[in-house]
């Protein structure tokens, strides 16, 4: 596999650019300069999360033991680790791509409890150690496509979700699998204040059909680049479904519930005309406000080094997953 060069100072976005982005975000949220000057506790609380200097930084993740199955070592150029861990959507910690890395250091992931229940014969609770020791870990190099029309290639580490589901023995009534993120507004500022969290309803929830969850490509991910996940990437466990848009990859999961009926999902509740339940990567179905025909590749270059490439149906995994949607109108069921 081709090695990707590391970031240099020339690749770093100028600090002024980040301040401008945040100013635009605040303006879009209706927070004016005059309003920000008011000495209220609420505004002080909001602004404290944008200063970026006194928040705890997360320690480096512990090295993990894992194998590299040949079928998942795609011959693709990896996105530099710095960008995988520094360019994130995790609105619980802010709207700017740099906010999660800056703000998530206070997220404590050990101890952790993940409960699996609902339409199962054998409910199960996993602790922090179970997440990395109960199942053999694998490194899988997957494409990652955001609904915002940018993409990465990431060496995720984890285990197939179907192995966990087999342990709990889904009942014949189980048709869907629902996931829920940790709810902790005291350490997740986006849950505490709608100006920081994009106005979403929290805790963040996502779901898959049972057959999607059982597919061999679907992973519960506990690491990246050889180490345990950092908080900004969804530690200690997140969902990875490589043929779907990134917002399906729910982070910091605390519960998995098998259900009879289709569960609600956060972005679909927020804007059902823009974010469908399925969220399969599809170059032929545009977002109402932008095209999905191509994508911006997040690579080793700087902000002016923009590479675009055509978007692949199912993000390049059509041979493996297209049969799941046989007979389904992908334009209606986006």
From Swiss-Prot:
Leader sequence residues: 1-44
Major localization class: periplasm
Catalyzed reactions per annotation: L-methionyl-[protein] + a quinone + H2O = L-methionyl-(S)-S-oxide-[protein] + a quinol; L-methionyl-[protein] + a quinone + H2O = L-methionyl-(R)-S-oxide-[protein] + a quinol
Pfam families assigned: Oxidored_molyb
Keywords: Metal-binding, Molybdenum, Oxidoreductase, Periplasm, Signal
Cofactor(s) the protein needs: Mo-molybdopterin
Biological processes, Gene Ontology terms: protein repair
Localization per Swiss-Prot or TrEMBL: Periplasm
GO-annotated cellular components: periplasmic space
Cofactor note: Binds 1 Mo-molybdopterin (Mo-MPT) cofactor per subunit.
Quaternary structure note: Heterodimer of a catalytic subunit (MsrP) and a heme-binding subunit (MsrQ).
Residues the record lists as binding Mo-molybdopterin: 88, 91-92, 146, 181, 233, 238, 249-251
Protein name listed in UniProt: Protein-methionine-sulfoxide reductase catalytic subunit MsrP
PROSITE patterns: TAT
Keyword tRNA processing applies: no
InterPro entries: MsrP, OxRdtase_Mopterin-bd_dom, OxRdtase_Mopterin-bd_sf, TAT_signal
Described purpose of this protein according to its UniProt entry: Part of the MsrPQ system that repairs oxidized periplasmic proteins containing methionine sulfoxide residues (Met-O), using respiratory chain electrons. Thus protects these proteins from oxidative-stress damage caused by reactive species of oxygen and chlorine generated by the host defense mechanisms. MsrPQ is essential for the maintenance of envelope integrity under bleach stress, rescuing a wide series of structurally unrelated periplasmic proteins from methionine oxidation.
Gene name linked to the record: msrP
Family: Belongs to the MsrP family.
GO MF annotation: an example: molybdopterin cofactor binding
Post-translational modification: Predicted to be exported by the Tat system. The position of the signal peptide cleavage has not been experimentally proven.
Gene3D superfamilies in the record: Oxidoreductase, molybdopterin-binding domain
Enzyme Commission number: 1.8.5.-
Superkingdom of the organism of origin: Bacteria
């Amino acid at each position: 596999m081709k090695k990707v060069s590391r970031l240099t100072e020339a690749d770093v976005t100028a600090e002024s650019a980040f301040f401008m982005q945040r100013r635009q975000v605040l303006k879009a949220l209706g927070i004016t300069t005059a309003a920000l000057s008011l000495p209220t506790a609420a505004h002080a609380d909001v602004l404290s999360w944008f200063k970026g200097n006194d928040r705890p930084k997360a320690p480096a993740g512990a090295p993990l033991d894992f194998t590299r199955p040949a079928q998942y070592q795609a011959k693709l150029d990896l996105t530099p680790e710095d960008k995988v861990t520094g360019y994130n959507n995790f609105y619980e910690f802010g709207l700017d791509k740099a906010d999660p890395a800056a703000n998530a250091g206070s997220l404590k992931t050990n101890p952790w409890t993940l409960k699996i229940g609902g339409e199962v014969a054998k409910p199960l609770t996993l602790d922090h150690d179970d997440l990395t020791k109960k199942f053999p870990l694998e490194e899988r190099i997957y494409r990652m496509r955001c609904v915002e029309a940018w993409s990465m290639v990431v060496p995720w580490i984890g285990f197939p979700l179907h192995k966990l589901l087999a342990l709990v023995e889904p009942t014949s009534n189980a048709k869907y699998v629902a996931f829920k993120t940790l709810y902790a507004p005291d350490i997740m500022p986006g849950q505490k204040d709608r100006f920081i969290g994009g106005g979403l309803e929290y805790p963040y929830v996502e779901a898959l059909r049972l057959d999607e969850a059982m597919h061999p490509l679907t992973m519960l991910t506990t690491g990246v680049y050889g180490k345990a996940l950092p908080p900004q990437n969804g530690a200690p466990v997140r969902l990875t479904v490589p043929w779907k848009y990134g917002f399906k990859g729910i982070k910091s999961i605390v519960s998995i519930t098998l259900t009879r009926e289709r569960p609600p999902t956060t972005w679909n509740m927020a804007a059902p005309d823009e974010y469908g339940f399925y969220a399969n990567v599809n170059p032929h179905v545009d977002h109402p406000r932008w095209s999905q025909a191509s994508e911006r590749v997040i690579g080793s270059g700087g902000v002016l080094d923009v590479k675009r490439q055509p978007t692949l149906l199912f993000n390049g995994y059509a041979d493996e997953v297209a049969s799941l949607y046989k007979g389904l109108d992908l334009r209606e069921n986006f």
